[in-house]
Amino acid sequence: MKRSEIDRYVQDLLDFARARQFPLPPWTTWTPAQWARTGGEADEIRHCGLGWDVTDFGSGDFARVGLTLLTLRNGRPGRASGKDYCEKVMMVREGQVTPCHFHFAKMEDIINRGGGRLVIQLYNSTADDRLDEAGEVRVQVDGIARRLPAGGELVLAPGESVALPPRLYHAFWGQPSAGPVLVGEVSRVNDDARDNRFLQQLPRFPAIEEDEPRRFVLCTEYGRL
């Protein structure tokens, strides 16, 4: 992905969150120079992977397969002390797919915080980590039990949420013609290095072409300032 594209997508989420009256912390707009001047007082942000994350999952087509995320709070994977939860906010565009995956340990609530409608496709997993293409899926939607066939699609309107247990395959996208979606995630500690299982082997983070100076720092870049 080009740096200019990444910066534009970060700005899009900043603007969208503001329009949906979802204020974000001041550090989300810090420049690279501000980050370089900031010392150990911000180590929780650095060590716990808080911050910006823009990916096309190696597709080369962000509008079709991609996601813009901001991790607002998280614990440190593998630590017995500290926060044992995570919160993210995401901008999911119409028809923009986050590919099918599950988490080995993380349970998460996916929340439609405003905008359009979020479509989530669900499958159970087998013992060898494949799709269970026959088994009925059971989830809780805002505390109400729901049953779907394998590969069934759950549509969340603004204000609705679904609890996804570990090892439940899910893909999601914004419903076409309904507008982008501001999506929240509340979960156990997030560990992108070890806890993700994508159905198809995909790069989690993109290679970046530095076509212009960066305006924002991604959560993977703090050690390179």
Model-derived segments and their meaning:
Residues R93-E94, K106-E108, N112-D128, E133-G135:
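Glycine- and acidic-residue-biased ligand/ion/polar-headgroup-sensing regions
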Residues P77-C86, V97-D109, R113-G114:
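A short beta-loop-beta micro-motif enriched in histidine and acidic residues
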